[in-house]
Amino acid sequence: MRPVYLLDSAILIDHLRGIGPATTWLRTLREGEAVISAITRAEVMAGGSSDERAVAFDLCEQFACLALTKESADRAAELRRAHRWKLPDAFQAALAINQDLRLVTRNSRGFDERTHSFVLIPYSVR
């Protein structure tokens, strides 16, 4: 199956923290339907105890990981200038756009679904 979704770190971190809507949404995915970026992988595996990092590693291993390329770097630079996004957000957007994927995030402040058709915000946390 060709991937459809690029998962932002917030989705996986919410799942690891036991946020129900994240887990529910992730369970709807079919095998191969979603991928993560090297940025997501690093962000998810950066924190926590060694036991928590082991769980995070196992979760990340369930998804193919997209590498950063010079094309995505160039697009990220353009997007950062145009939208004043933080660099990791610009890279996520660039990868999603370049790979024709929906960026799944809950970062509605950075990414507005109404403005950016490549964005999917499947739930919110209050």
Regions found by a protein language model. Name each.
Residues 32-34, 61-64, 97-102:
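Short active-site oxyanion
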Residues 1-36, 45-58, 126:
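Short, well-structured N-terminal submotif of metal-dependent ribonuclease cores
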Residues 42, 62-82:
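Acidic catalytic patch
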Residues 11-12, 40, 72, 91-92, ...:
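Alpha-helix capping/helix-boundary segments
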Residues 8-9, 44, 76, 96, ...:
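Generic structural signal for small/hydrophobic residues in well-ordered secondary structure
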Residues 2, 93, 97-126:
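Acidic, PIN/NYN-like endoribonuclease modules and their adjacent C-terminal/linker elements
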Residues 81, 85, 101:
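Short glycine/serine/threonine/alanine-rich loop segments
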